[in-house]
Amino acid sequence: MRGTLYIVSASSGTGKSSIVNATLERDQQIALSISFTSRQPRPNERHAQHYYFVSADEFQRMIEAGDFFEYALVHGDWKGTARQSVEPQLAAGHDVLLEIDWQGARQVRSKIPDAISIFILPPSRAALEERLRKRGQDSEEVIHLRLAAAHEEMAHYDEFDYTIINEHFETAVSEMSAIFTASRLRRQTQKIRHANLIQTLLTP
């Protein structure tokens, strides 16, 4: 049975990575695909754990070689998912989660229409700004740029299957877990997973 592809998107400061990491700690059936990026690592980030950090030239070489499943220019830096991180895993029946922006999500849906997509929104603009400032990673100028970009990014929430409002962290994690559980209970999934049982039950 082919694996399920999940897409999770949000604007900066929404808590996307924290929600994804907490959810995947509880759900060992889904593998997080680590993205490539041309930006510099932040102090708490590690190569091959948070991102694969490469130069802009190397990223362009990978684009030209057709190595990416999806890629986009985000806040002035390139981000992308390698084909090798997704296609073999899905073919082997493993579920894969992509933590990408709306541009990449649109590319993925054009290739895999049955991918399940989730967009995370903040409870308010004030909360989003507060979270960006609490990170302590960006200058005032960068914070203003990210807030301006967030408005454009959030406008694409209606392109996704599910919307989670991250007002209370544990609630948001539970809601994401519920989406994963529900997707496994879909008729088309259960029909394949329990084919022998269903055939036995329906045989006169």
From Swiss-Prot:
The main location is cytoplasm
Domain Guanylate kinase-like as annotated: residue spans? 3-181
Q: Which GO terms describe its molecular function?
A: ATP binding; guanylate kinase activity
**Where is it localised?**
Cytoplasm
Q: Which residues bind ATP?
A: 10-17
User: What reaction does this enzyme carry out catalytically?
Assistant: GMP + ATP = GDP + ADP
Respond yes or no to whether keyword Protein biosynthesis is given for this record. Answer: no
This entry's Enzyme Commission designation comes to 2.7.4.8
Keywords attached to this Swiss-Prot or TrEMBL record, sorted alphabetically, are: ATP-binding, Cytoplasm, Kinase, Nucleotide-binding, Transferase
In terms of Gene3D superfamilies, this protein maps to: Guanylate Kinase phosphate binding domain (3.30.63.10), P-loop containing nucleotide triphosphate hydrolases (3.40.50.300)
Kindly state one GO CC term assigned in the UniProt record. cytosol
Q: What is this protein's function per UniProt?
A: Essential for recycling GMP and indirectly, cGMP.
Q: Which family does it belong to?
A: Belongs to the guanylate kinase family.
HAMAP family in alphabetical order: Guanylate_kinase
Identify the NCBIfam families for this entry: guanyl_kin (TIGR03263)
Protein name according to UniProt: Guanylate kinase
What organism does the record attribute this protein to?
Answer: Xylella fastidiosa (strain Temecula1 / ATCC 700964)
